[in-house]
Amino acid sequence: MKKNENAHKKMWEGRFSEASSKLLEEFNASINFDKNLFEEDIAGSKAHAKMLGICGILKKDESEAIIKGLDEVLAEIRAGKFAFKIEDEDIHMAVEKRLSQIIGAELGGRLHTARSRNDQVALDFKFYVLKKNLEISSLIKELIATLTNLAKNHKDTLMPGYTHFQHAQPVSLSYHLLAYAFMFKRDFERFVSSYERNNLSPLGSAALAGTPHKIDRSIVASELGFADCTQNAMDSVSDRDYALEILFNISVFMTHASRLCEELILWSSQEFGFVSISDAYSTGSSIMPQKKNPDVAELIRGKTGRVNGNLVALLTTMKGLPLAYNKDMQEDKEGVFDSVATILSSATILNEMIKTAKFNEKNMLKATKTGHLSATDLADYLVREKNIPFRTAHFITGKAVAKAESLGLDLSELNKEQLKSVDENLDENAIKFLDLHASKEARTSKGGTANKSVEEQIQILDDWLK
């Protein structure tokens, strides 16, 4: 046999008497997108070749020659000198074909011993997803640090807290920002948890039932940094939980980010004037010279819809598949690649946009003077000091709110006489409970908005970030 006799052929064509149609090659191929897995594919092949050598399935010099050849293929791809061709079908066949051209078809053909593309692609894709879990979690941690540091400077910046998008109770900007920090902390924990749960190597599972070759799967797992091997070969090649999990985790993060961006969009409007987004992260209008648009925040909000769609797409693809591998599963990658790229860019630019944003403390304080934010404090005063049932206190306070509105005032602006005219229980001591800063500071319960509680929350995050 000549050295490169089979190097140009499809690796599976022995059983076929007709060549593949051009239509099939174009429809069936995944090389245009799974070439993104070249690093993982070659790393997996090198570990597999090393294991075959250690187990005596390949001679030591054969194993070393294959690994050296794979390094050459890797160097070519990194240098942009590798020609990806549609007829090569996928990254696995493209790499093996080029390897066979470099070291010879006979030796190159030995690499696939005790391996199927089913477990090979499971390894490549899982390896990629695991690495991205760590990369994403690192960016989220940076975002949490930014929010935590910003919160330290705004413990006394008073603003309205909202329910139903109506003014509810006075809170600090620090407290509001920390709410997002703790959201993103949960996101971080989901990515880390997914990494830990899925950190098992599927390589060596072969097509679906294992292999008769005397391999040692733990060698490959250790070489690639996996914690262990998967336990069932059929499950290993059928499993895409790790892909679904990263898509879900990305969707939840992007949903949280979208909520934050929605607020930044609103807060940067003239109606609110709570924040000014840096020129570096804003755009203008082609026709209106005065415009300063929060396009970064709007794009993150918009991209959230797309990543949510990627999750639903893969869930739908997987829902009806019998065991084990099916070609439908080739559709697992593009959505993941897209969602991963989206969260990496979104988390990075969101962090920078928040770092450079300027908050208007005066406008935030002014906003607290409407909406009767101290109403709950007045009701609580009646319960604590006058021993009035909360429902009765609620009714009395509601009358006080109505009185304020009839006078064109905020509840916090009523004087002693005006309060007393509503109900005799609203005595001169009640007036101090209408103060908005006092209202904020009264909420000392764990997780509350009082400075003492906020400082505890900041300390929790600081300790966690170390």
UniProtKB/Swiss-Prot annotation:
SUPFAM superfamilies: L-aspartase-like
Catalytic class of the enzyme: lyase
Recorded GO MF terms: argininosuccinate lyase activity
Pfam families in UniProt: ASL_C2, Lyase_1
Annotated catalysed reactions: 2-(N(omega)-L-arginino)succinate = fumarate + L-arginine
A single BP term in Gene Ontology: L-arginine biosynthetic process
PANTHER family: ARGININOSUCCINATE LYASE
Record-given protein name: Argininosuccinate lyase
